[in-house]
């Protein structure tokens, strides 16, 4: 908690990439308790849906303010059903579409490169919507 408070004093926004097994990760648990807002990303595949379903009882605990949680269906491909994700997560606030360009950047270890391809435009637009909603910019 002290770390998060110190970070808030030196930066206007603090982004913490939490682990997915919150019960055994003290930084993630404290971050979720102290955050102004949280993005919960989950892929639209059976493995992610199953894991998320197993964690929902913990994530919906009264300690975690569910009103400040934005639920994001991530890596959505045309053949995926976001309805299944909405069933597992509750309402989905955002849908991050699959981007081949992003996958190539990930595989090459170059995630900080600009995304310039036309077929990445839907992904970039959704990221802009998330930034506007969560950070107000």
Model-found features: residue ranges?
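Well-ordered beta-strand positions
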Residues: 13, 37, 91-94
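P-loop/Walker-type NTP enzyme "switch/lid" segment
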Residues: 1-9, 103-110
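Conserved Switch II/interswitch segment of TRAFAC-class P-loop GTPases
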Residues: 21-22, 35-53
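Conserved C-terminal guanine-recognition region of P-loop GTPase G domains, centered on the G4
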Residues: 52-65
């Amino acid at each position: 908690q002290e770390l998060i408070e110190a970070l808030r004093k030196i930066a206007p926004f603090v982004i913490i990439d939490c682990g997915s097994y919150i019960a055994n990760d003290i930084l993630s648990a404290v971050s979720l308790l102290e955050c102004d807002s949280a993005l919960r990303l989950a892929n639209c595949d059976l493995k992610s849906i199953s894991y998320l379903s197993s964690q929902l009882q913990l994530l919906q605990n009264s300690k975690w303010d569910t009103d400040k949680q934005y639920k994001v269906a991530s890596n959505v491909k045309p053949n995926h059903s976001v309805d299944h994700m909405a069933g597992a997560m509750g309402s989905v606030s955002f849908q991050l579409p699959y981007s081949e360009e992003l996958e190539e950047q990930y595989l090459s270890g170059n995630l900080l490169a600009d995304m310039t391809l036309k077929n990445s435009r839907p992904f970039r637009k959704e990221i802009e919507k998330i930034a506007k909603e969560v950070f107000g910019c």
